[in-house]
């Protein structure tokens, strides 16, 4: 699956690394990830149903890597190894434990910047181990360790989070965020950016949203943006898969009953 993270983070990585190599003024890096968002959900890349002005501006004023793909995974959670690959520059066969653990021998991008004088801040999702997180960041807040916010815990509406632990242990139980996941991560990032205004030390802010990964909880205002009846279904839509590909009982296939109708799919698309 082609992910939106290639649109923003890869270009930021290139700028950061090239700037360091030239010995120029060290650039600040805002590294934004979103979870399970496909590139074909972006208006600037051809989707006529979506309204994505901020992402469109990044594309129109920068660049979009439209032929960049994740090269697979050896586990069910594709985001875990792909995040580890993105952070370390390693291929899928080089990351360990499918990315669940990043060994000290594999330096992450924020760790490299930290070792070169950067403040490194993180908020949101970290889908690897505590030790690699501790090596990578000097500060952070509203940190989520894991893959997704569970349905049974009210999903994005009650994210289980950690404050930054300078010991790197994170052995205290998580607290429940008092707002939607995207807002608590954005608020943490904004609060950090405010501290950089009069600080000459270069920084990297790693802002890792868990949306639009399911559960498809939505903020009330955003639920009104899209009318299901006005959305298009994909050209290759079928009520059910035409043959058993061996993956028909996985979690993603349980989100809607089969046979599926265009109306059901449009409703899910409006939530997505």
Model-identified regions with their sequence ranges:
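Formylglycine-dependent sulfatase
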Residues: 2-8, 20-272
């Amino acid at each position: 699956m082609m992910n939106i993270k290639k649109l923003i983070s890869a270009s930021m990585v290139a700028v950061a690394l090239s700037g360091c190599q030239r010995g120029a003024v060290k650039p600040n890096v805002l590294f934004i990830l979103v979870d399970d968002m496909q590139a074909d959900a972006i208006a600037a890349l051809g989707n006529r149903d979506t309204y994505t002005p901020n992402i469109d501006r990044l594309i129109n004023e920068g660049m979009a890597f439209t032929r960049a793909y994740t090269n697979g995974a050896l586990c069910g959670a594709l985001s875990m190894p792909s995040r580890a690959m993105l952070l370390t520059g390693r291929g899928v066969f080089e990351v360990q434990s499918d990315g669940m653990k990043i060994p000290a021998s594999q330096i992450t991008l924020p760790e490299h910047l930290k070792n070169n004088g950067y403040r490194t801040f993180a908020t949101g999702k970290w889908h690897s181990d505590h030790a690699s997180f501790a090596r990578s960041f000097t500060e952070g807040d509203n940190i989520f360790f894991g893959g997704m916010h569970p349905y049974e815990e009210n999903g994005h509406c009650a994210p289980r989070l950690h404050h930054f632990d300078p010991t790197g242990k994170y052995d205290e139980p998580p607290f429940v965020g008092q707002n939607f996941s995207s807002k608590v991560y954005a608020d943490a990032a904004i609060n950090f950016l405010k501290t950089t205004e009069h600080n000459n030390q270069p920084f990297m802010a790693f802002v890792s949203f868990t949306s639009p990964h399911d559960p498809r909880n939505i903020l009330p205002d955003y639920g009104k943006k899209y009318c299901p009846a006005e959305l298009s279904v994909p050209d290759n839509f079928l009520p059910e898969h035409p043959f058993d590909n061996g993956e028909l009982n996985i979690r993603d296939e349980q989100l809607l009953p089969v046979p599926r109708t265009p109306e059901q799919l449009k409703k899910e698309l409006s939530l997505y």
